[in-house]
Amino acid sequence: MNFIQSIHPAKPLRYLKWFDILIITVLMFGEFIIRSTQQFMESLSPSTVASVAETTTNVASDGAAYSSNFTFQLMMLGITFLYLLIRNYDFKQLPIRFSWSVFIWVPLIFAIVGIFGDIVTTLSGEYNYFNPQLIPFIDPMEIIRKFMSLTPMAIGYALLNGFYEEFFFLGLLTSVKEKHQWLVLIYSVIIRISFHTYQGLLWALVIGLVYGLFYYFLYKYVVKNLLPFFLMHALADMFGSSLLYLLITWRT
């Protein structure tokens, strides 16, 4: 009886144990960490840089890849929920609620993340988004045009992935005792970085360290609602972490 109760506590489980976090990490991100690490290691070889970049681009734009990831993540999410149900995790403690403030927080957070992304892109020499010659091509209506050009699968996958990642990082990884929160925060940064290394070390650090900490402190001490982060992350998956790219008309 004691063994069964240790697995499935009588009272709802508010604080996850270290083994809960490790098991859920492997379930939700183990495969993606392996894939990302493999692509990153391949990119370090000069002879494979071009092929890796081409493969990454093709995967990102391929509907079949969206469908494959969608199915896999849905399956892993289902297994994770089953595990949490067995552990009698207290889902009610997660603040997921719709309010009018969501319509403010989502675009505001996306804009902050997007502008920072544009600064990083410009300073790294990838592309100068702050070139004055781009000003005439800025059109807010471009947001609608770019959204309308997305496929239903791309939108569906972005929504799923936004929930998938932030449910883990901001939801589950904050379900720990206060004395462990800083250690778990460091752990969350490492995990965020580890499955984004396929984008290059610079962007893996930006996403994992800068964005990860920004999301955490904003959620924990200001917003206190997971929904805006689910939706904002979905927008970033749809359009990338760039505000100016979204606003600029690129058609000639």
Question: What are these model-predicted stretches?
Answer:
Residues 115, 146-252:
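Transmembrane helix-loop-helix hairpins at the membrane interface
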Residues 5, 80-98, 228, 232:
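Cytoplasmic juxtamembrane interface segments
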Residues 44-62, 89-161, 250-252:
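Juxtamembrane helix-loop-helix connectors linking adjacent transmembrane helices
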Residues 17-88:
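Alpha-helical transmembrane segments in multi-pass membrane proteins
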Residues 14-32, 105-110, 185-188:
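Alpha-helical transmembrane segments
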Residues 27-35, 72-76, 109-117, 121, ...:
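Alpha-helical transmembrane segments of multipass membrane proteins
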Residues 1-13:
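Short, Lys/Arg-rich, polar N-terminal cytosolic tail immediately upstream
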Residues 37-48, 86-90, 119, 123-131, ...:
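Membrane-interface elements of multi-pass transporters and channels
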